[in-house]
């Protein structure tokens, strides 16, 4: 099974993010599944890829050429697919995925998982789609809390 994970290339402010990312990576590797991710060696992306590899799993990174030019890629992964731009990257990650998980991240992470959720909603894609709301990043305050 190919598990596409969307998450940031930054460490994040909450240490529980790194722990959760490493736990997911270990599970992916030990379960015999394959990780599909953004290809970066930095931050949470790097932590995820490293934990999958350490658990004996395969990692496919999908990264646009301009990130390769800036040397952001993780060279030790199983396979690196280079795309011309971010749009092609998103499409390739969707094409390869069987399951989609988004960790808390920035606008790019939100854009990526929103596109998958839209495709599922329109019945253009049949796949589990998980918005992992760790640290309650995606929870808006209730009107009472404002």
Predicted regions and their residues:
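Glycine-rich beta-alpha loop segments
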Residues: 1-58
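Short glycine-rich anion-binding loops that position phosphate/pyrophosphate groups of nucleotides
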Residues: 8-11, 41, 65-67, 105-108
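Glycine/threonine-rich flexible loop motifs
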Residues: 14-15, 110-113
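A short, small-residue-rich loop immediately preceding and capping a beta-strand
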Residues: 35-36, 97-109
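Short internal beta-strands
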Residues: 36-39, 60-64, 129-133
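Acidic/glycine-enriched connector segments
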Residues: 44-103
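Single conserved hydrophobic/aromatic residue that forms the stacking wall/gate
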Residues: 138-146
